[in-house]
């Protein structure tokens, strides 16, 4: 029996990806910080889709969380054939507003933990006849974003990492896909403490439903795509990052986020 392992799956895009994968008959492993939300999601998945769903409450900012995840899977004989690196968050405003510890925690969750999970699980994924790594990046990965500068940089890392390891794993059973959502109806803005009314209003106009984003992500993963950009507006935005001068893009983002 195989499982899909999804991080940051207690709510938002991660939770919807767990539901989408369960809908397609996958057994599910979900990881996040909030044990109550995880338990509720696991119960709902088992009841709704008649698949197994187990959860582990962990803070993925803890460098030891990856080893704990691997031990949990090994002790319970959970065979993982899908790894979804979804957990992540942002810090908004001037980059000087936050200290190094705050950035280290964010970079651990957004960058180091996904890479560490990949390093730990690739040897196991290679044992499966077909397996997948799905990394959730962001439309912010395509450019510098003043006001979300370090977050955007962390998502550029995820995108570049995904494409690089995809190529290196091209002759294996593992397919790697990066997904770049734009504004999505989740708690990202409140967690990032975005205060710019202009940015909040823009996001509200462009917000995609998390369920729709999750379906696009899973469709892209199973189709073996290298990269998925969710929604027409975000696709246009990605094209503009290639066409327009970087200075114009950065000025626009800075104006949007009030820095």
Residue ranges, per PLM feature:
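Residue(s) in the substrate-gating loop at a strand-loop-helix junction
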Residues: 138
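Active-site helix of classical SDR
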Residues: 118, 154
